UniProtKB/Swiss-Prot annotation:
Subunit relationships: Homodecamer; pentamer of dimers.
Binding site for 3-methyl-2-oxobutanoate: 45-46, 84, 114
EC number: 2.1.2.11
Entry's Gene Ontology BP terms: pantothenate biosynthetic process
GO cellular component: cytoplasm
Organism: Endomicrobium trichonymphae
Bilayer-spanning residue ranges: none
Keywords: Cytoplasm, Magnesium, Metal-binding, Pantothenate biosynthesis, Transferase
Catalytic reactions on record: 3-methyl-2-oxobutanoate + (6R)-5,10-methylene-5,6,7,8-tetrahydrofolate + H2O = 2-dehydropantoate + (6S)-5,6,7,8-tetrahydrofolate
Top-rank taxon: Bacteria
Residues reported to bind Mg(2+): 45, 84, 116
Protein name in UniProt: 3-methyl-2-oxobutanoate hydroxymethyltransferase
InterPro entries referenced in this protein's UniProt entry, alphabetically: Pantoate_hydroxy_MeTrfase (IPR003700), Pyrv/PenolPyrv_kinase-like_dom (IPR015813), Pyrv_kinase-like_dom_sf (IPR040442)
SUPFAM superfamilies recorded: Phosphoenolpyruvate/pyruvate domain
Length: 266
């Protein structure tokens, strides 16, 4: 596939062509997804939920992100590869932020990083961008702030929240972010932010007017069933297919129906 870059994504904003993004955490899935010419693979810290079985994303480490990014990198064919910076990898000091972003790029092979937050982290965003690491912002429902917000809640419904989100988005753009993810933001607010910014917005549960869309791959394939957000559309029921296949395998082994002659060596 033709290689996508940051410039590719920026040009799609200008042309009005929608940007496509999915999360990805491993080599095999990266091969499958990128074979369909997707624009962006995001190694999300959502791997804490869907791959590591954590209750939330807060326990995910930089080493976790590097490990999974390396796996995705080996399977990726052409997509821009972005990796989340996990909780407390950029909040404490600017130096930590740059150091950890550099590790994710140098050791993991990511081509950009993503951070959650607005005006309160713009010094980190600028420092990472100045260090020649492309960076994406993330506003609205920010899973790393679950304890601050008291759970996973739609953000931007009050006038105060609306004004803050717009200011945050503009601050991220001004300090070097090349795109912003908007999660669980009311559709009309996401539309307004998209129209105000020169950089692309990528929506997840934020309506139809963002410049692109992203979903957690395990959600849209029907593999992760612990919880399904309202905004998810399931394009397959892979989880049910796996359960059926495993049941059939167990039954055939117990009945002596597998392996058959064609599955043996002579």
């Amino acid at each position: 596939m033709k290689k996508k870059t940051v410039l590719t994504i920026l040009k799609k904003k200008q042309s009005g062509e929608k940007i496509t993004m999915l999360t990805c955490y491993d080599y095999v899935t990266a091969k499958l997804i990128s074979s369909q010419d997707i624009d962006v693979l995001l190694v999300g810290d959502s791997l804490g939920n869907v791959k590591l079985g954590y209750e939330n994303t807060l326990s995910v480490t930089v080493d976790d992100m590097i490990y999974h990014t390396k796996s995705v990198k080996r399977g990726n064919d052409g997509a821009l590869l972005i990796t989340d910076m996990p909780f407390m990898s950029y909040e404490i000091t600017v130096e930590d932020a740059v150091k950890n972003a550099a590790r994710i790029v140098k050791e993991g092979g990511a081509e950009a990083v993503k951070v959650e937050g607005g005006i309160e982290i713009v010094d980190r965003v600028k420092a990472i961008s100045d260090a020649k690491v492309p960076i994406v912002g993330h506003l609205g429902l920010t899973p790393q702030s679950i304890n601050k917000f008291g759970g996973f809640k739609v953000q931007g419904r009050t006038e105060e929240e609306r004004g803050r989100l717009i200011a945050d988005a503009e601050a991220l753009e001004k300090t070097g972010a090349f795109a912003v993810v908007l999660e669980a933001v009311p559709e009309q607010l996401a539309k307004e932010v998209t129209e105000r910014l020169k950089i692309p917005t990528i929506g997840i549960g934020s309506g139809r007017y963002c410049d692109g869309q992203v979903l957690v791959v395990d959600d849209m394939l029907g593999m992760f069933t612990d919880f399904t957000p309202k905004f998810v559309k399931k394009y397959a029921e892979i989880g049910e297919m796996v359960r059926t296949a495993v049941k059939n395998y167990i039954d055939e082994v117990k009945k002596g129906q597998f392996p058959r002659e064609e599955n043996t060596y002579k």
